[in-house]
Amino acid sequence: MKVAIVGGGIIGLFTAYHLRQQGADVVIIEQGEPGGWSKAAAGILEFTRFVINRINVRSYPKRYLSMALRGDARIKTWDWRWISAYLRAWGREPTQDMWEAIKTLGEYSWRQYRALAEAENDFAYSEEPLYEVGIDVAAALEEAKRDPLSPKVETGRCCGREALVYLDAAKLSTEDFVARMLRELQGVQMVRRRAQEVAGREVWLEGGDVVKADAVVVAAGYWARKFGIPVAPFKGYGFRTTAKAQSMFIEMTKGVAVVPLPKWTKVTGRFDLDGTEDHSPSARVLQRAREVLGNFEVLDMSVGYRPCTPDGFPIVDKVGEVVIVTGACRLGWTYGPALGKLAADLALGKPGVEALTARRFRR
């Protein structure tokens, strides 16, 4: 069976990985560098904690407006269909079925990363605490007690301040992990072209060529909006730097995540509703990071567009004959292994997970 995957980000790569394990012939269609749009992520994995994605809680618009007024967020892409879906989802609590699905995604992904690291840890995988500073720690502890995923948290100190310590976290080097996945996928056909349209089992490429397959998976982030999926691009910036840090932490008041790795320290920031190629806010990330870390050199910068649904939960569904996997927002890396497996299973004719379908936005 031949499966064409549109999108070579982390979820597209995991989809290809699982399809290949099940004996499928796979072709990945990606206009840029495979994994290129995913490298900007910090590499923080939060398997039992979803709070960072809860963008539809009633308090979130006020928080986002505060970020924008401080200059730490902006809106450049006005997708009125997405905004309309957001207003309908605003304040809506997830179903128990959704929480069960998310719990299963986290458990599966955790096992997958561990297994890959045990085979060869060439991507700096490490399970260690994540510190959050600049928050109301007491309130966060109370919130964690009510969390359906039962995250392990405690009070600690980081950067000379009181912090919430999330104990189930892990980290990896996104750059090194993409390289690892490409080695795992040696022999998979890579088509470095832009996909213009998907029609049933055909992918029409820029220039007029057509890729035909027995099944098509679209794992191309917010491009899924072409299929009527409510998903929007929230841009972020990632820097490999020479900064020094003892622990993995997020400075919430400045909107900066810091991940120390063996060869560099990753610094990331911004959550801009922005699908443009204007990357000028990246300077603000560095400014904010230097307020925390002092001066450092930048080795390189990468940009990513997090595909976010109005409720922050991912979608794995079929639209006609096409499998769509998107919408994991800030947790695409955390749930990448499991979402790739679900997308692969759908492409092979296996059943999906009802809670993760797009039907929840049509109710």
Swiss-Prot record:
Homotetramer. InterPro entries: DadA_oxidoreductase (IPR053679), FAD-dep_OxRdtase (IPR006076), FAD/NAD-bd_sf (IPR036188). The keyword Membrane applies. Belongs to the DadA oxidoreductase family. Optimum pH is 7.5. Half of activity at pH 6.5 and 8.5. Optimum temperature is above 70 degrees Celsius. Its EC number is 1.5.99.13. Catalyzes the dehydrogenation of D-proline. Can also use other D-amino acids, but with lower efficiency. This is D-proline dehydrogenase. Its cofactor is FAD. It catalyses: D-proline + A = 1-pyrroline-2-carboxylate + AH2. Keywords: Cell membrane, Flavoprotein, Membrane, Oxidoreductase. It is a peripheral membrane protein. The keyword Cell membrane applies. Pfam families: DAO. GO terms for molecular function: flavin adenine dinucleotide binding; oxidoreductase activity, acting on the CH-NH group of donors. One of its GO terms (cellular component) is cytoplasm. It is found in: Cell membrane. Gene3D superfamilies: D-Amino Acid Oxidase, subunit A, domain 2, FAD/NAD(P)-binding domain.
